[in-house]
């Protein structure tokens, strides 16, 4: 027979969101990629009714299909095609959001070889239509993440068509650091709210 106490001691529990709000997130220690953390952030924004932003599916080129039965076609060979635009898009407070995400283990620069001409052209087209376009750059070794407006990326790319790396100093001068947290993990909408919709950014 189990005797249960009549007056159990109630412990004060701190809400998880409040408890971890300012805790720094280390993606490597958590076994999570930067992309996964952005996806988790977007899921948080969607669940809270803050924004609707999704990762665009990577296009696939089907090479060979097996038909063991008429009703069951099986793809046996395919490969990923190069994405023609950016990684993410959606809407926030009536504004179209479009951005790319890149990660590096380098400490002083972001390799520009990861950006392709068609992506730069797409970003320029988004800006022309008054959309909010940017890149999220994560320096894994430094544990630093930056929001770089698309215009700053385009300006640097046009110097030599993206043949050299973008110095971290340039990113710090022209971008904004994103303070990582728990809920959401990569709060990039804070930058948009404060610097763009708030009117601080020229």
Swiss-Prot record:
It is an enzyme of class 3 (hydrolase). This is Holliday junction resolvase RecU. GO terms for molecular function: endonuclease activity; magnesium ion binding; nucleic acid binding. It comes from the Bacteria. It is found in: Cytoplasm. The gene is recU. Transmembrane segments: none annotated. The keyword Nuclease applies. Its EC number is 3.1.21.10. HAMAP family: RecU. Mg(2+) binds at residues 85, 87, 100, 119. Binds 1 Mg(2+) ion per subunit.
